[in-house]
Each structure stands twice: as C-alpha cells, then as structure tokens.
Amino acid sequence: RQFLADETGIETAYTELIPEDATEFRTVAEAYIEQGYNIIFGTTFGYLDAMAEMAEEYPDVIFLHCSGYLKNDTNFGNYFGKMYQPRYLSGLAAGAMTESNKIGYVAAFPIPEVIRGINAFATGVKEVNPDATVEVVWTFTWFGPEAETQAANALLETGVDVLAQHQDSPSTGIAAEAAGAKWISYNTAYGQDAAPGAFVTAPVWDWGPYYVEIVESIINDEFVAEAYWGGMETGLVSLYELTSDVPTETASLISDRTEEIISGSYDPPIVEEEFIDNVIGTVNP
C-alpha cells in the first residue's frame, strides 16, 4: 500500500485485522465507499463472498480480492501469486539441513492455497532428502502467536529440527531458536530480526509493483476484471536470500531451480486435494 501511494501519489487508507466475517468486512468497506474511495482491496480469503455481493451492489467501485477465485466481467477481480514456487525452493533448503529427518510445518487453515504450499515444500524436501518427513500441525488462525507457539513446541518435542510455517507471526521461529532448531520463515519481516539464530530463508511477497500496475490500469480505463496469478517471473513471489548455514551444493541447486522456474522450463507440481507421501497429517482435520 505504501509503495502504491509513493509511486502514484494517490490517497490510500487501510484497516487491519478485520475478522473473516461478511458483516464486519461490509461495515468497513461501506465506510470507505461513503468517504469516496472507489477501489477496495480485500486481502484475506474469508472476504470472498462479501466482496462478490458488494461488487454487484456498487458497480462504480472496483473490488479486488486477494487469494480468491470469484470474479465478474466488470468490477470484481482476484489476484494472487504462485507462492508454491518459492515454498518448493525453501523445501530444498530444509531437506538438506535436517539432521533428524523430521521437519515440522505450522499451518493456518486446510484450504487449497495452504495445502499446495505444504506439498510444494515437501516436494523440495523429498528431492534432496528422500528419508525426511514433513509433519503438519494446524492452528486454524492466520495470526495467533499463542497457538503458533504451541504447535511449534509440539512439533519440536517429537524431534523436529527444522520448522516451516504458513502463519503471520514469527512465533514459530522464536520457538525454533529457543530449541536450537532451524526455521523457514514466511515473509522477511518475520525473519532475521525475530529469530536470527534459527532463520534460514523465507518465501516472500512483493505486492507493490502489482498494485501500481492494476491501479494505473483503472486510472487509464484499461482495467480488466481477471484472475491474476503471478509467478516468480513477475517478481510477485520470490525466495529471500539464504543464510550461510545452507550447504553450498544445495544453494547451487536452489539457484538452478530458481532460473528454471523463472524461465518456465520447470514448475513444481500443484497438489491441493491431499498430502503427498512424505507429509504426515491430514487435509481434513
């Protein structure tokens, strides 16, 4: 949002931590519309139905939903990135670094986005270490430091020595550092500062350029209500720099795979209905 404001000079505003509830979202969105805002970004999956309904009710407002799948032909689109690509790369690092062959994954909700990310990560793990397993614990929250800490500690108690996450707090990393384990973060802000001794790398987002592109298309009357899914070739998703703890051979492999993904010559498999065979857990908890 700040990148968008800096690059375009347009006025932006935001509200954080709106519950995934249609009434709550509608209250906030309608308040913005009444103030004259005519582009509404909803950045949580749970806003899907409310945004679809509001797009019909407010045809002069553009609604853009992050991580969803609904759209119309005029004023409602969705956008997301192929986060499974850098998650696969981070799995290569995790598989090479585990000594116990037990890797833990603290995950929010069993939805397709999260499941395909876990499977892509586990694909990377398996490529470099066929003996390693990835055990998943669900927290049922995107941001819940206490629940994340409990899940991380439960995994660590089983002998896990590398933790990964699909969560919005650094609690998993803090638990990993306290136990002497390694940590694959999620977004750089939760990485080196929160648990520098555990941090290895992180799949990361860079939303700014996309926001500028889509808003400029609206300003120029070139907007198309589409389902946008950008991969590593767009810069929307990437793998943060590796620490020196990652073995040189593995770092070289990650570099090669990164080039292959960007060029289009390789793409990790997308599996989101069930877990692949080296994952311990269930998609229907």
What are the residue ranges of the model-derived segments?
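A residue-level marker of the well-folded mature domains of exported/periplasmic proteins
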Residues: 1-285
